[in-house]
Amino acid sequence: MTATSTGPSRPIAFATRYASTGRWPFITMVNLRVDPASEAADRIEKTLRAPLPRQFGHTTVSGPHTIAWLGPDEWLVLSQADETAVAAELREALGGDPGLVADVSANRTTLELSGPAARQVLEKGCPLDLHPRSFGPGQAVSTTVGPVAVLLRQVDDVPTYRLFPRSSFAV
């Protein structure tokens, strides 16, 4: 097993030939609630340069932003951009319309599991069907891994998964 730390914005990782784990610090996370049929939602989509996903498990990606569907009127914006700027731009787009823009960057941490055995490792503690026909790249859902509630996102076909547990459960 190899351990590496590559600086404050790169993952801290442990690797074997079957899977690697890492922690990605400093991901901007903004919780967004808005009526998807509203003019405010249209303005937010223009600000993010991406549509808000409208279906369970879907995500959209544009530049530094990934938008994960959490519910019919709720999304989590994950971004490599500055948290203050992202939240401020989204608040401006929301304007005076009903809704919520909340910086929740300190609320969760980001763990990554990647490699040919990553799916099998997750299947040991996750009740979700992770078979590629059921869950694949570009999908994100709320689930549990062991006793810990997480937002689980599959990034690619390697497979690489990003897990977003609440900070109180972080390692």
What kind of feature is each model-predicted range?
Residues 1-171:
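Basic, glycine/lysine-rich polyanion-binding surfaces/domains
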